[in-house]
């Protein structure tokens, strides 16, 4: 049954979801950049990030139920360290965690049209893993952004992994 559902989903994924993901990333990324420049990075993060993530969960479709959100103090800053199993980790965290935060992400993501400029203008932190001095400077910048209820999210593996095995953790998050 699972294989049948997988096969049934493939045309939808390639004809509807993937094109939607590409277009929505470009549109929401540019919108976020403009909002961050002219209105507020916080509003840009909500519209360009949280709304984009929830919309992509809906179109995928992924149904998310969050438990325990009432235990999170929105005025408190947190360092959140999460495993990175798929692209959907980003949708779930951005769309449903319910707090203001900045991502710490690999610099290569800066090159994605829409996404890169949107994330930069919102204030997310890019890590250049090929240059340790720049990486350390980026981590210091991340530490400075953990104020007034703004948190930081790391994926300590540095990238997604295929399968269920965890990758080796990088030092930056710790």
Residue ranges, per PLM feature:
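A transmembrane-helix-recognition feature enriched in membrane-embedded lipid enzymes
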Residues: 3-65, 117-118
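Soluble catalytic domains of membrane acyltransferases
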Residues: 59-174
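Juxtamembrane, membrane-proximal amphipathic segments and lipid-exposed surfaces
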Residues: 1-2, 83
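A general marker of short, structured functional hotspots
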Residues: 2-8, 13, 74, 165, ...
């Amino acid at each position: 049954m699972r294989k049948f559902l997988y096969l049934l989903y493939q045309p939808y994924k390639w004809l509807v979801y993937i094109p939607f993901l590409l277009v929505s990333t470009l549109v929401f990324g540019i919108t976020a950049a403009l909002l961050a420049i002219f209105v507020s990075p916080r509003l840009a993060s909500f519209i360009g990030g949280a709304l984009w993530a929830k919309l992509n969960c809906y179109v995928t479709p992924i149904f998310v139920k969050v438990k325990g959100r009432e235990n999170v103090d929105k005025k408190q800053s947190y360092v959140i360290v999460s495993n990175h199993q798929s692209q959907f980790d980003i949708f779930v965290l951005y769309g449903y965690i319910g707090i203001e935060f900045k991502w710490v992400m690999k610099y290569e993501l800066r090159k994605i049209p829409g996404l890169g400029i949107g994330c930069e203008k919102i204030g997310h932190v890019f890590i250049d893993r090929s240059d340790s001095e720049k990486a350390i400077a980026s981590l210091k910048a991340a530490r400075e952004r953990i104020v007034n209820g703004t948190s930081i999210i790391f994926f300590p593996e540095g990238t997604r992994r295929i399968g269920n095995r965890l990758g080796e953790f990088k030092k930056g998050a710790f």
